[in-house]
Regions:
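Hydrophobic alpha-helical segments
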Residues: 1-152
Length: 152
């Protein structure tokens, strides 16, 4: 598959700023392991092979188990994820899919039981970032398997 547009080359300033925004999230209230889980799930939902490959590699670098990585797509039926992780995955899925009726108070309340307002805010920015990268990479057919860089 040939990449349609090298967006980093064509829009270098926007690319750098979007990357800086994404990197800023690494120091947020959301721990690296949760960032990895959420990023993987969002990229699964969006069908972004490039991003999924990158996030899985990053999670492995951070010590995530192969068993849990294999269970992320079925997290709702798995007993391998904590209540906090389930809340974050719920919020990630709902903001990625954006149902016509919006986010129910029930879902919000269940998520808020596990995440502070600051954590939920940081998580929401993370979700927006991953969705943005997914859409760019899917649209321009960025090939997966190219990233081998170690964690920064």
């Amino acid at each position: 598959m040939t990449q349609r547009v090298n967006f980093a080359q064509q829009s270098p300033q926007l690319f750098k700023k979007f990357l800086a925004f994404t990197n800023e999230l690494i120091g947020s209230t959301i721990e690296a392991s949760l960032i990895d889980l959420v990023s993987i799930r969002i990229s699964q939902l969006n069908g972004c092979d490039f991003c999924l490959d990158m996030h899985v590699k990053q999670a492995a670098i951070h010590g995530e188990s192969e068993l849990r990585l294999n269970e992320i797509s079925a997290w709702q039926d798995s007993n391998l994820f904590t209540t906090r992780e389930r809340a974050a995955l719920t919020w990630s899925e709902i903001l990625t899919k954006l149902p016509d009726q919006g986010v129910s108070d029930d879902v919000y309340d269940r998520v808020r039981e596990q995440l502070s307002e600051k954590e939920l805010s940081d998580l929401s920015f993370l979700i927006a970032s991953v969705n943005g990268w997914d859409r760019i990479n899917v649209g321009f057919k960025t090939a997966s398997g190219r990233l081998t860089r170690q964690s920064t």
